[in-house]
Design a protein with these regions (language model features):
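Bacterial Sec-dependent N-terminal signal peptides
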Residues: 1-25
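Short solvent-exposed beta->alpha transition segments
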Residues: 26, 47-84
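Solenoid-repeat scaffolds in large eukaryotic assemblies
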Residues: 42-44
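A mature extracytoplasmic/lumenal domain signature
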Residues: 47-50, 57-59, 87-89, 100-103, ...
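Short beta-strand edge/turn micro-motifs at domain boundaries
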Residues: 107-134
């Protein structure tokens, strides 16, 4: 058999190995669990030292400890019932996720942006808005 007949098979095998070796971007499961529980203290463990919060009518950069208080107040006003990640991906050293936070007072769309700091993947942005985008 001629070598040129094997070339397409070899290319197919190499491409398959490359696809298997690439892991899909995943937000740490502990972050989803913390949102589902409405646990601001647990979320803080995965935050950068400064984080941008956009929560309904509030938008600012906060130090980690202040961000925890802001999120605690949000969860007091909107007790969490469930959190489901709808989409996630990655680009360069950043990962993102879009999820739905179900609360006792309605559903919210959550955007998360995580970036690598050293070897850790840390939350740099949390945006929570009403499900219809208003």
């Amino acid at each position: 058999m001629k070598l040129k007949n094997f070339i397409p098979v070899i290319i197919l095998l190499v491409n398959s190995l490359v696809l298997v070796a690439q892991e899909p971007a995943r937000i740490p499961g502990e972050i989803s669990i913390a949102f589902k529980a409405g646990n601001a203290a647990e979320l803080t463990k995965y935050m950068n030292s400064t984080v941008e919060l956009l929560l309904l009518d509030k938008s600012d950069f906060y130090k980690k400890n202040v961000a925890e208080t802001v999120l605690k107040n949000f969860f007091v006003n909107y007790p969490a019932k469930d959190f489901i990640i709808r989409h996630q991906g990655a680009k360069n050293d950043a990962q993102y996720a879009i999820g739905i936070l179900k609360t006792e007072k309605g559903d919210f769309r959550v955007y998360l942006l995580l970036k690598k700091v050293g070897q850790e993947l840390l939350i740099h942005l949390v945006r929570i808005e009403t499900e219809n985008g208003n």
